[in-house]
Amino acid sequence: LFPEGAISRNGHLGEFRRGFELACKNVNDDVVIVPFYLRGLWGSQFSRSSNKLKTLRRSGYYREIIVAFGQAQPKTSNATTIKQRVFDLSVQSWQKHVENLPTLTDAWISSVRKAERRKLSLADGISAPLTADKALAAAWCISRRIRRLSPEQNIGLLLPTSTGGVLCNMATLLAGKTIVNLNYTANAAALTAAIEQAEIRTIYTSRRFIERLEKKNGDVITVLQGKHIIYLEDLRSEIHFNESFWRWLAIRVLPTRILKRVCNHTHDSQQTAAILFSSGSEGLPKGVMLSHQNIMANLKQISDVVNTQEQDVL
C-alpha cells in the first residue's frame, strides 16, 4: 500500500491518507503493518521531476535503488505513527546512499562527459566563456602545476567568485589537495590565524585581484608577505595550445573510467576536500573540515529540493 495515494511531485514524503487504517480494522489479529521506503526513483524517467533533473540523473543501464524495510507495527497504528517510521527509514536509506557517493572530482568528470558539447558551462564577464569539456581541460592543466609546485596537502586560495576561481578550486581537488579559500574581507589577525591553523605555505591568487585588494583591504597584502605566492596569470602563460588541445581531446575520446584515473588524483570520498573558516568576528576563526562525502551529500540534497529546470542559472 502507498498511503500517500499519488506519485510524489517533489521527491519527498507527502500526507499519509488514513484509508489503510480502515483496511486494517477488519483483518485477522495476526496481521501487522511493515513500513518500507523506496530511495532512488526521484529523477528517473517515471518520476515527476523536471526534464533537466532526469537528464542529469541519467545513469545508463542501471541506477541505485534502495528498498528499506522497518520493524513490523501493530495493525492499529495510525497514519502519523506509520509516516514517522517511514521517515526514519528515509534517513537510514539516505545514510546508506551517501556511503557510495563518488568524490567531487569523479562526479564532475562524469557530469562533463554527459554535458552537451557546445553548451556554456562557465562565464564571468571577464574571462572567455567555457564549455564543460574546456573547463575540465583547463583545470587539468592547472592541476599538474599545482602538484609540481605545491607538495603540501593544504592549498590556500585567495580569489573572487569567477571562472578563474572555479578552475583553481577544481584543479586543486584534481591534484588531490585540500582547498582552503581565504576570506579576503577579513582582518589581518583572522587571515593570519586561518593560514597558521591550516598550515598553508602556498597561496594561489591573481595579480589583478591583488591590485584591487590593495585599494580596499591593505591588511591582506601584509598577511601575504613571507608566503609562497603563485599567480594564475603566470600559470596560464605556461599552458600552451598543444597541451590544452591534447587534454581536451582525451576528455572527448577516453572512456570515463580511464579519464578519471589519468586526470584525477582524489579517489577517497572520506578525504578532506575543503577547510572552511568562520569570519573571526567572535574571536579567532574556526576551521571546519569537510570531506568529499560531506559536500557531495549537500549537493545531492540541494539538487533534490531545487528540482533544477533547463533555464536555471547559478
Predicted regions and their residues:
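A cross-family acyltransferase "interaction/gating" segment
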Residues: A6-S77
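Conserved structural elements of the adenylate-forming
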Residues: E21, K25, A135-I142, P255, ...
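AMP-dependent adenylate-forming
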Residues: D106-T131, L149, A273-L276
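Conserved pre-ATP/AMP-binding loop-to-beta segment of ANL
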Residues: E116-R118, I229-F277, L284, D304-V313
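Conserved AMP-binding/adenylate-forming core of the ANL superfamily
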Residues: L120-L149, Q153-M170, N187-T192, A250-V253, ...
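Conserved AMP-binding A3 loop
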Residues: A128-K134, H265-H267, A273-A297
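Conserved S/T- and glycine-rich ATP-binding loop of Class I adenylate-forming
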Residues: I155, T172, I203, T272, ...
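Structural core segment of the AMP-binding/adenylate-forming
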Residues: L174-W248
